[in-house]
């Protein structure tokens, strides 16, 4: 049996507890034994993410932040992502006159910092490990006692690099790189344990799922995650810092007209037109769908909302929700269980993620203005250069307004929808 450790979460008294479950369970139940109040991220936290390209691209894809905003506890968290591609602990260069990180942390009234480092540093190999430990301890010390929210000491969460993916001839040294990354992950864990900090180990679970050569790739070049990779790692990272409710699981017996559900309440199961119809009342938001068609890693399949319908007569069946077609499959596939994350409610969840991404884009325009020639260069005194400060302020205001809108945006629950499976009249689609 293979086990994974997507996180170390703090326990009362500052001790660090390793959380591990069977790999076959993917990551859906890795920390469900802990209450949200005991998690590294707490309701209402104002979170800042800093670090390398992994952190930077969390902002671009938005899965991690959306997963956090979907957590059931209120109030919701507020996130600002200060990740910068290529950042290392000892190399965090910024343009001339760029605002300090401290000023942004104070402006956000930051309660907790999620720090992603270790990838760039790992290229120094074994010889670089002592310097990495020293730099990481210095980083922790630099935030020790700081009260960016004006009230309480900021909390730190350390996040390891992901594994190095084998892409054949594109990554000829993946075995050596993974040995180095394992060493740097272990060093980061040692520092976290010594400093009594939460630690999220992304290296081990990503290395395990990358071993499935038949599954879709998680990265574009062995190092940088693609959209699917950020969906998967976003879920892992969320499981490392908070308690994630399991996804929807609907189970129907079309013959006995019985049903059970996780995340939903199923009512009024009845036969209809050679199939079955039932009402579904949602108790939790739908889970974000992976951003690709076709199969995903078998170990990640339990992260998806699913419907299983047993004892259908042989044939193909169309699932509709409130009359809208969702997907078609054969009776044996329905009996085995199928992911149902293309429903109207799942499309609403994707729209919410896009709103998160838009907020983050407005923040970047205000925080990391791209046209330096108008800020400190030769066009600083031009009309466009003189107008830029007001534009930057406007972008910051837009980001704050959109953030507040996201925090207030209701998550419609206890909604009841009519689900129905009836014999299909078209070829089955393969979700």
What is each PLM-predicted segment?
Residues 1-18:
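N-terminal secretory signal peptides that target proteins for export/translocation
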Residues 3, 7, 29, 428-429:
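Serine residues within intrinsically disordered or low-complexity segments
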Residues 5, 17, 27-28, 387-388, ...:
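Compositionally biased, low-complexity segments enriched in small residues
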Residues 17-22, 430:
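Intrinsically disordered, low-complexity, compositionally biased regions/tails
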Residues 22-34:
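Bacterial N-terminal signal peptides
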Residues 36-39:
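Boundary at the C-terminal end of the N-terminal hydrophobic targeting segment
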Residues 41-43, 62-80, 87-430:
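Alpha-helical cap/lid subdomain in secreted, periplasmic
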Residues 46-59, 85-90:
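Catalytic nucleophile-elbow at a beta strand-turn-alpha helix junction centered on a G-D-S/GDSL motif
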């Amino acid at each position: 049996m293979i086990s994974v450790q997507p996180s170390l979460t703090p326990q009362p008294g500052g001790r660090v507890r390793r959380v591990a479950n069977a790999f076959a369970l993917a990551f859906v139940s890795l920390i469900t034994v802990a209450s949200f109040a005991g998690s590294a991220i707490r309701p209402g936290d104002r979170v800042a993410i800093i670090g390398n390209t992994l952190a930077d691209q969390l902002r671009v894809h938005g899965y991690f932040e959306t997963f956090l905003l979907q957590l059931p506890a209120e109030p919701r968290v507020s996130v600002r992502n200060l990740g910068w591609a290529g950042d290392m602990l000892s190399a965090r260069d910024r343009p001339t006159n760029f605002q300090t990180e401290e000023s942004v942390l104070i402006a956000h009234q930051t309660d907790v910092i999620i720090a992603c480092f270790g990838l760039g540093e790992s290229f120094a190999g074994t010889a670089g490990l002592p310097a990495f430990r020293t730099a990481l301890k210095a980083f922790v010390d630099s935030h020790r006692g700081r009260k960016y929210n004006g009230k309480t000491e900021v909390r730190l969460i350390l996040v390891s690099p992901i594994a190095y993916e084998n892409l054949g001839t594109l990554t000829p040294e993946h075995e050596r790189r993974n040995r180095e990354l394992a060493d740097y992950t272990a060093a980061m864990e040692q520092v976290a344990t010594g400093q009594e900090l939460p630690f999220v180990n992304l290296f081990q679970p990503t290395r395990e799922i990358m071993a499935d050569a038949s599954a879709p790739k998680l990265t574009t070049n062995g190092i940088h995650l693609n959209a699917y990779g950020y969906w998967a790692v976003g879920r892992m990272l969320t499981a490392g810092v908070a308690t994630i409710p399991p996804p929807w699981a609907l189970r129907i017996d079309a013959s006995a007209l019985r049903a059970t559900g996780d995340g939903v309440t199923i009512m009024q199961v009845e036969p209809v037109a050679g199939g079955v119809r039932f009402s579904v009342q949602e108790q939790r938001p739908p889970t974000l769908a992976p951003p690709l068609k076709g199969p995903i890693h078998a170990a990640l399949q339990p992260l998806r909302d699913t419907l299983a319908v047993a004892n259908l007569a042989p044939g193909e069946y169309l699932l509709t929700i409130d009359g809208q077609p969702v997907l078609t499959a054969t009776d044996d596939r329905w009996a085995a269980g199928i992911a149902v994350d293309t429903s109207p409610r799942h499309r609403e969840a994707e729209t919410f993620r896009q709103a998160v991404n838009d907020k983050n884009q407005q923040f970047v325009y205000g925080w990391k203005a791209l046209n330096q020639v108008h800020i400190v260069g030769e066009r600083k005194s031009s009309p466009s250069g003189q107008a830029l400060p007001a534009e930057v302020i406007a972008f910051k205001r837009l980001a704050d307004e959109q953030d507040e809108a996201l925090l207030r945006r209701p998550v419609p629950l206890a909604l009841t929808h009519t689900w129905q499976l009836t014999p299909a009249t078209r070829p089955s689609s393969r979700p």
